[in-house]
Every structure is written in structure tokens, then in C-alpha cells.
Amino acid sequence: MKNINITRKITQGMYALTTQNGGCIVDAVSQISFGKNPLISVAVMKNNYTNQLLKTNDKFAISILGKEVNPEIIKTFGFNSSRNINKFERVETTKIEEIEIINNSLGYMICEIVDSIDNDTHTLFIGKLIEADVFEDKEAMSYQYYQEHREEILKA
């Protein structure tokens, strides 16, 4: 028997994925290589508008969210479509390499898209790390922490 619930035990974080003209909250981000040109992967649901945007852009950014993140970031990027609103008008950002970075984050990674893989529900975008910085050395928010504290985070 295949018990898919075991996948919930895979450690994941909470991230704001941004590209030109939009972004969303993601949890499936991974460093897939080290060395001179590290590769970062991010999985984005196919029915998410940000997925469409990534297919027409050459870069994306990942802002790492901390446990003390401003709840507006999760509300704005997690429960609204960039097709309908300008998310960057609702949260404080800084533009780096033509991509908006979330100011109230632990840090960011900007990647140049080098490949993508489609499956039935998601597209895996693979990017070469071209710019990164750490803003704060605090604890990152895990997906498990978010699920366990979701109500209190979202009502703040």
C-alpha cells in the first residue's frame, strides 16, 4: 500500500517566490548542487499564475521567511493571484536584478532559470544562483510550523 502521507515528513520551508510582475508562497525549494554555480530548484503548481510568469521570464527570487514574518506577506502572496492584484504594492520590497525581494525576510536568492521539468501538477524550475544575501540570522519558518500555527499567523 502506498501511504502518501509520509511526504508530509519531508522538511520544507516557507518562501516567497517572486519574478517580474508577480509571485506566490512556495514550500518546495531545494539546493541541488554546490560549487561555483549552485543550482536551486523550486516547484510551482501548474494552475498558479506565477507558473505562467516564470515560463516567460529568465529569473526568479526566493525570499526566505522567518517564524516572525509579517503575516501580510503570507496573506498577500499565498491567498491572492498576481493576475488580479499587484502584490508588490501591499508589502515592502526592494528591486535587485530586476526582481522584487521581500524586505521582511531572512534573506534572498536570485536565480537565472536554466531548466524546467513538467509533471502532472507542478513545474520544477531549476535556477543558477546569481545573487544572494542574508538579512537576519533568525530561525526560518518550516512548513510544519506554518501548518501548526496557521490560524494565529493569519489572524494577526
Where are these regions (language model features)?
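Basic, polyanion-binding surface patches
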Residues: M1-A156
